[in-house]
Regions:
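N-terminal alpha-helical targeting/anchoring segments
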Residues: 1-134, 149, 153
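TRNA-recognition modules of translation machinery and tRNA-sensing kinases, especially anticodon-binding
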Residues: 27, 130-427
Length: 427
């Protein structure tokens, strides 16, 4: 959410930013917000004037009563009753206006960074850099679920009978490989990157949902617990950032660098939907995430550090990757800048998304009231960032395809062998 003062002083910049994101249907919101904000401030001023007048009259009544002029005091008390009635109406109007302004402000997208390429959707994202040499073996690579089925590592039919499409049973060495990747990611982030490991709540309240994402994202992603003010998280970023809700942080304690493990639950109601037989887009998966809460001047430096952590992690497992700068139309409303990390698929002979890093500047912090007290005592909003270290279902696809041997076995990179009981290959 933007600063109202910024919108008030820079309406043209806000409108131009909306156009850059190809959301012209939101342009009327800016003028509506400005009009309602003006009316709100006028209402507040009128109410303040009435309160001041009420205070003045109250003193006058006290003075008259002290002088024994009860009749005169009673006459003036009628003015107090009229003021109280008018003040109640103004306060009700103020509440409605404030709610309306907030609702509209939450629909206006964050200001994107000047470096973000302009484009309508992910087809116009821009490649930044490649790491590792993509290899296509001279033998045919089966679909990832077929590789796992040959190794007795997955049962999609049983999962479909139990829960429907978008779920799976992982078994044996594949299940162990899944856990090994997560455990290695945890230790990589703790031991090599110095992040604090946290296991967060897997459900959050609606007030946190409103703070971490837009309503449109929430509708397409999150499962609500019936009869409760609780939602299953779509990523641990939600509960990790929510940890700082309604807090004032000490500047000397920044940055907070957390890495978290959690299961994730998603409706996947968007254009892509879920796969009938596959683990790329599913309803339930696990993930190792990282978040940073920092000073505004440090957020862009942390932004590159975060996505390079993911690049480094994948390269330790010998998986070629590339980074893509997300264009303006591909950015969610709260994001200022975002980079996707994609892994090489030898079967498809192309890269596919395995993680995303985002700098949300102060958009989430304003919604969640995450402030920082500086050394001079002044308070300002923190910047928040998030990044995927690894989501094993997608990582499994990249891992299996890039480490598959012609005989159907899977090589285990040295970094993972301690987490696989010393095994150097499976199958």
């Amino acid at each position: 959410m933007l600063d109202m003062k910024f919108v008030r002083e820079n309406p043209d910049i806000v409108k131009e930013n909306i156009k850059k994101k190809f959301q012209d249907y939101k342009l009327p919101l800016v003028n509506e917000v400005l009009m309602e904000d003006k009316e709100l401030r006028q209402t507040q001023q009128h109410a303040d004037d009435l309160r001041a007048n009420r205070k003045k009259i109250s003193k006058e009544i006290g003075k008259l009563m002290g002088q024994g002029k009860k009749e005169e005091a009673e006459d003036i008390k009628q003015q107090m009753a009229e003021i109280a009635h008018e003040l109640t109406a103004l306060e009700e109007k103020e509440i409605k206006l404030r709610e309306s302004v907030t609702e509209k402000m939450m629909q206006i997208p964050n200001i994107i960074d000047d470096s973000v390429p302009i484009g309508k959707d992910d087809s116009e994202n821009v490649e930044l850099e490649r790491f590792g040499e993509p290899v296509v073996p001279d033998f045919e690579i089966p679909y990832h679920t077929e590789i796992m089925e040959r190794l007795s590592g997955i049962d999609l039919d049983a999962a479909r009978r139990v829960a429907g499409n978008g779920f799976y049973y992982l078994m044996g060495d594949i299940a162990r490989l899944h856990s090994a990747i997560l455990n290695y990611a945890r230790d990589f982030m703790i031991d090599k990157k110095g992040f604090t490991f946290v296991i967060p709540p897997y459900m959050i309240r609606s007030s946190v949902v409103d703070g971490v994402m837009s309503f449109a994202e929430m509708e397409g992603m999150m499962y609500k617990i019936e009869g409760e003010d609780l939602y299953l998280i779509g990523t641990s970023e939600h509960s990790m950032i929510g940890k700082f809700k309604d807090t004032i942080l000490e500047e000397k304690d920044l940055p907070y660098t957390y890495t978290s493990y959690s299961p994730c639950f998603r409706k996947e109601k968007g254009a892509h939907g879920i796969e009938e037989r596959g683990v790329y887009r599913i309803h339930q998966f696990e993930k190792q995430e990282m978040i940073v809460v920092c000073k505004p001047e440090d957020s862009m430096e942390w932004f590159k550090k975060l996505y390079m952590n993911t690049v480094e992690f994948f390269r330790t497992l010998d998986i070629p990757v590339r980074t893509l700068e997300c264009c303006s139309g591909d950015l969610a409303d709260l994001k200022c800048k975002s980079v996707d990390v994609e892994a090489w698929s030898p079967r498809q002979k192309k890269y596919f998304e395995v993680g995303s890093c985002s700098n949300l500047t102060d958009a989430q912090a304003r919604r969640l009231k995450i402030r920082v007290k500086g050394e001079n005592g002044e308070k300002y909003y923190a910047h928040t960032l998030n990044n995927t270290c690894v989501a094993p279902p997608r990582m499994l696809i990249a891992f299996l395809e890039n480490n598959l041997q012609e005989d159907g076995s899977i090589l285990i990179p040295e970094a993972l062998q301690p987490y696989m009981g010393g095994k150097k290959k499976i199958g």
